[in-house]
Amino acid sequence: MLALNTLLPASAGILFLIQSCYHLGLYRRLYLHSQTQKEGTDTPPLSIILVAKDAASDLQKNLPAILEQDYPNFEVIVIYEQSSDDDCEDVLKLFSEKYTNLYHSFIPDSARYISHKKLGITMGIKASHHEWLVFTEPNCRPSSNQWLRKMARNFTSDTDIVLGYSNYERVNGWFNRQITFDTLLSSMRQLGRAIEGHPYTGCGRNMAYRKSLYYKQKGFSSHLSLQRGEDDLFINQVAKGTNTRVEVSP
């Protein structure tokens, strides 16, 4: 019993040390990447696509930070689900009066037996005017007005996908600290593997890819029956070490 009582803490300590070294290595890799990555100089026109559901308050809070990005030519397309208890349409109409680059449409109630998120993204892509598509979500807000410029510096001629960093906003409370830490570790693993040349997933809160890549893959046809997968499964299918770049600035 004494040996067991000694062995368990020792094993836990070794495991903790291994995990710590692993994550410190990931952090170092991300830091070095941010200091040494080669940047593109073009600012191609962009289409930002969001799909909203019961998100009127989130759009009212976060959409201005997206629409007021310091970037020469971009459009914002919001596709929302019709809902009797949501004011998305009113919020978007109000913003459209101020921002001429905002476009919006809705997913009809008759759309059934298909993921509304994937349908909304598909509608947004078909409505878009530009080759480069940037994706985020209504409950997300860029950390500055340079978000699009930082993403666009990765849009080189041999790049099809850009995976961006995202995390939760820090507020008081144990639960927020825990989920923020977990999301940080997840992002480090995801982006770290991509930097190594082995991208395997993406996060719909902050990523970009070419419209032509979407059509070449025939959209989400291979997993259309699944409710999710519009970001992680799609990126897993199309991302390669040679066509994917990473942006670590939020």
Give the predicted meaning of each segment.
Residues 55-58, 84:
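Donor nucleotide-sugar binding loop of glycosyltransferases
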Residues 226-233:
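Acidic donor-binding loop at a coil-to-helix junction in glycosyltransferase catalytic cores
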Residues 165, 245-250:
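Catalytic beta-strand/loop signature of glycosyltransferases that borders the donor
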Residues 44-47, 75:
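Cell-envelope/extracellular polymer assembly enzymes that use nucleotide-activated donors
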Residues 130-141:
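Short beta-strand-to-loop acidic/aromatic patch adjacent to the donor-nucleotide binding site
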Residues 1-41, 189, 193:
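N-terminal membrane-anchoring/stem segments of glycan-assembly enzymes
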Residues 63-111:
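Acidic donor-binding segment of Leloir-type glycosyltransferases
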Residues 96-126, 130, 150-217, 221:
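Long helical/loop segments within the catalytic core of UDP-sugar-dependent glycosyltransferases
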